[in-house]
C-alpha cells in the first residue's frame, strides 16, 4: 500500500493533534502514564479538556466505534479541532492532545478514522487466530504510518462488556508472543491483558474476596505477566484497557437516587499507580466517567424534580467528571505537568 494509492482526506496535524510516539517515549522515561478518556458528547469533552489544561497533562481523547456512530464522525472531527483551540483558550499554550480510535474492529474502520483526521488508531484483532491478528494489524500499520498516525495492537482478551466489545473470559497475554507480534506488525504500542476488565462490573462476586466491611475485593492484577512482557520488550509502550476503578461513592449516589448497580467493582487505584510507573504508558478509563456523569444527573433529578433545563443537570455532570479526571491525572497516573 503506497500513499499515492489512497489519499487521506484530513491530516491530524492540520487539526492541531499529535500522535502518541513522542508522548509515550516521554511517559516510559518519566515513569507515568497518559490518560486515555473515552468521550461521546460535548460535556465529556469539555470536562476532559478543562482537566488536562488545568493540570497540563497530555491526554488521549478516545472514541469507540459506538461513540463514532453516536456522535457522527464529521462532528467528532470538528469537536477534536475545537478541543485544541479550547485548550489554548484555557491557557494551555502547547496542548498535547491525541484523537484515538478505541477498539477498531476492521481495516476499513481504521482507514476511515485516519482519513477523517484521527492521530492514532487501535486495531483489535485479539479475538482472531494469532496469524490473522498479525496480518490485520500489519495492514492497518502500513496504511496509518503513511500519514504519521500511530497504531495500537492487542494481544490477549479482556473479559467484560464495553460498547460492541464483549468477552466472557480473560485470555492473558503470553509474553513469549509479544516480540514476534510487534516485529511482524510494526505496531507502535501494545494493549495487553493482565486481569483488567471492561465495564462497571469487572469481576463476579465469586472471583473476589470480601473485606471486614463486607465490600468486594477484586483479584490482584497479574503483574508477573506485565513483567514478562517488559522483559521481552524493554522500553516498548504498553497499554491497559478496562482500567476504571469504579468509585464506590459514585455507585452509592446512583443507587441512593434510584439506580440499581449491584456488585459494581473496579481496579484498585494503587494497582494502577504501580502500573503507571512501569512500561504501561496509556491507561484507558471510560466507566468511571459514566458513573460520575450518571451520579450527578440522578442527584439533580431526585433533589430538584421540577428542573427541566438540561444545563442544570449536565452542568453538574460535567463538573463531576472534571473532578474525576483531575484526580486520575494528579493522584493515579502521575501525568500532571508533563505537557507544559
Specify the residue positions occupied by each region the protein language model found:
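Single conserved hydrophobic/aromatic residue that forms the stacking wall/gate
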Residues: 1-11
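Alpha/beta enzyme core
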Residues: 20-29, 42-67, 73-94, 103-237, ...
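Short catalytic-loop micro-motif centered on adjacent basic/acidic residues
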Residues: 34-38, 99-100, 122, 238-240, ...
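Shared catalytic-loop signature of beta/alpha-barrel
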Residues: 61, 68-72, 272, 281-299, ...
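Short acidic/histidine-rich active-site segments
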Residues: 242-245, 265, 285-289
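Extended, intrinsically disordered, low-complexity segments
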Residues: 296-340
Amino acid at each position: 500500500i503506497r500513499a499515492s494509492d489512497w489519499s487521506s482526506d484530513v491530516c491530524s496535524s492540520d487539526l492541531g493533534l499529535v500522535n502518541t510516539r513522542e508522548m509515550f517515549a516521554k511517559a516510559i522515561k518519566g515513569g507515568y502514564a497518559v490518560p486515555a478518556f473515552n468521550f461521546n458528547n460535548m460535556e465529556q469533552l469539555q470536562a476532559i479538556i478543562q482537566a488536562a489544561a488545568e493540570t497540563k497533562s497530555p491526554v488521549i481523547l478516545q472514541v469507540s466505534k459506538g461513540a463514532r456512530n453516536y456522535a457522527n464522525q464529521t462532528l467528532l472531527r470538528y469537536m477534536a479541532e475545537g478541543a485544541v483551540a479550547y485548550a489554548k483558550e484555557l491557557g494551555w499554550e502547547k496542548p498535547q492532545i491525541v484523537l484515538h480510535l478505541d477498539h477498531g474492529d476492521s481495516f476499513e474502520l481504521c482507514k476511515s478514522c485516519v482519513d477523517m483526521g484521527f492521530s492514532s488508531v487501535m486495531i483489535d484483532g485479539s479475538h482472531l487466530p494469532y496469524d490473522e491478528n498479525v496480518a490485520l494489524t500489519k495492514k492497518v500499520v502500513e496504511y496509518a504510518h503513511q500519514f504519521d498516525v500511530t497504531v495500537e495492537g492487542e494481544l490477549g482478551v479482556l473479559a467484560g462488556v464495553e460498547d460492541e466489545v464483549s468477552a466472557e473470559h480473560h485470555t492473558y497475554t503470553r509474553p513469549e508472543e509479544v516480540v514476534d507480534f510487534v516485529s511482524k506488525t510494526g505496531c507502535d504500542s501494545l494493549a495487553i491483558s493482565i486481569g483488567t476488565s471492561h465495564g462497571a462490573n469487572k469481576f463476579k462476586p465469586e472471583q473476589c474476596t470480601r473485606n471486614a466491611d463486607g465490600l468486594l475485593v477484586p483479584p490482584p492484577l497479574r503483574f508477573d505477566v506485565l513483567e514478562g512482557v517488559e522483559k521481552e520488550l524493554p522500553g516498548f509502550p504498553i497499554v491497559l484497557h478496562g482500567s476504571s476503578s469504579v468509585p464506590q461513592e459514585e455507585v452509592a449516589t446512583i443507587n441512593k437516587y434510584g439506580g440499581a448497580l449491584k456488585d459494581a467493582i473496579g481496579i484498585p487505584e494503587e494497582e494502577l499507580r504501580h502500573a503507571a510507573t512501569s512500561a504501561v504508558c496509556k491507561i484507558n478509563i471510560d466507566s468511571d466517567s459514566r458513573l460520575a456523569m450518571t451520579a450527578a444527573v440522578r442527584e439533580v433529578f431526585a433533589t430538584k424534580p421540577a428542573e427541566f433545563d438540561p444545563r442544570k443537570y449536565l452542568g453538574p455532570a460535567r463538573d463531576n467528571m472534571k473532578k474525576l479526571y483531575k484526580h486520575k491525572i494528579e493522584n493515579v497516573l502521575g501525568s500532571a505537568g508533563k505537557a507544559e
